[in-house]
Amino acid sequence: MNKKGDEIMELIPNEPKLFELPEFADKIRLSDNVLYHLSDIIASFEDYLKLINECTNGNNIDMLYYWLDEAEEELISSCNIEKHKFVFSNKELMSGDLFFESLNISQKRIKDIHKFICEHSDSKSSLVGEYRKKPAWVGNVYQDGSVEVKWWGANIEDIEKFMKSYIEFYKKNSLKEIHANPFLKAALSHLLFVKIHPFGDGNGRVSRIIQNLSFTSGINRVYDTNLKLSPLNISTNIHMNQITYVRRINDIPFSIKDFNNDAVNRWLDFVLSMYDEQIHFQTEKLKNTQIESQNKAFLSEAIINQSEKSKINKLFK
């Protein structure tokens, strides 16, 4: 659908009809390609987890700062995907409980995450930490002023209901692979949030943070770990494959009636490829990183205060 830019407000929104997100997830039938890709990644990831344990070697503080650096790079890369600037420091990340208290989510926490990314970036959202009050569409604006609308976000009257359903999906436990496997659940958490598009700006950035929360929670459940920060961050990889990333999302109808299993599987396979790339990159990085010497400057009592020590303990215990 093409319209001149000054006519965009005259478009009649083709917004998705309200439906239950767990039902969307349960309709997914994994392709042979995704299942094969997944088994290969799991084997590589388990080797990577062993390497993490070897590098930690009982020194929790050093590993904390290593992962804080990784978290900082992830947030910056996530902003770069939509050409935003992101400015913050490890100290700011540790100053609040946004990332350390829990891997669970709620509508309040999602709004707090949105507020965090808006306050630390050049976000254009006029409603910081609040759901949008206007229709939202995703597409292209061309040099001649024409507009191509790819898809519409949820109707503003349905956002709260969609988000309630989203929380139910996020928390759902099931033996089905789409819920039980951390890689798949995280990828679908990312997709569904973007498709709801609850905020006026920052939906992609929030979705990638939620993906990391979901992934970390899933890894803890499957491997009996107690991580609070994601052991894999794929925004750098997404940024390098941005055209495919956008196409995979745009190709998926956000609907039960028009559900497209092949399109969803292409999205899952894309995200698995991003994780696969990151596993190999991080494996080599950890092998070539002397964590103790790299972070020695951080270990001063003058730098690590009592509050931060408390968070360090929460991170690993």
Summary of predicted features, one role per range:
Residues 1-200, 204-317:
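FIC/Doc superfamily catalytic core
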